Amino acid sequence: MSRPYYNPKPIRGGGPEAYIGVDHQLTEPWPEESSNVKLVAHSDLNGWGDAFQIQVGGGYCYVAASGVNGHDGMTILDVKDPANPKIVNQITDSPAARTHKVLRINDEVLITNSEIRPSFKDDPEVVGGLRIFDNTDPVHPKFINYIEVDGFGIHRPIYDRKRKLMYSSGFRDGYTGKVLLVHDMKDPWAPEFIGLGWLEGQKDGESPSWDPEIVGDGAWIHEGNPFGNYVTCGYWDSGIVMFDLTDPAKPEFMWRQNPHETHGWPGCYHTFLVPDGSEFAIVTHETTTVNCDHPPAFVTFYDMRN
């Protein structure tokens, strides 16, 4: 079996300019990776690349993008016939903030994130947090309001439909890096901030609970997912973390594991997810180098029965 394309000296970070114009050198999927999978349809989104998150409902598909090689904004497709997706609208957003995550809360409410790009941090017209849309007309969402949070805003919101709570990786004054923000979504038109969770060492005045030489400034939450009354979190270079949200207003840290520190595995923990009805978790890493030049990261499975 041939190995994927690999560059021993990958380009990492540097912002969007590092990605523009780079020749794509990735391999195609291996045959065994496409077992029992059939391509039904494809849309080039009119050249709007860099698709990040997709939500489908009511016969429409909402695709959020963040423009490195594409556009900042959202594409709406009619997918009533899944084999023939048709673009029905494209909404361009300001490049001042990333709005690359979209959530379809119900038939009427659509939410995107708003994460301010560092170079626009002092722009008074840029708001970080959540953006609320009236989606009564599913082809023409209408912006209603911002739900503002501190700092650069919110990176990745996840909606817990069973508990009507939203778990976001976002910023909070007095804390370093992104922390877990909890919003009450009983009124989806007006999300209410009710709780905050963090890793010891993120709050001002606390000592790091991680190895600073290995983790560096990578101790921050990327994503929080519901698992009953718990939230499972990919915590970037500091591994995976679980919080007890029996009281969502007072998230309690339970434990952290980080093979990046203990076993030299890759960092960039993206997602820690227990599928609904399962007793096993899936943990993924994110590739953070141009052209995915870094050696492939892992997909790990955890037994969550205890």
Annotate each PLM feature.
Residues 1-306:
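Feature marking well-ordered beta-strand scaffolds used for ligand recognition
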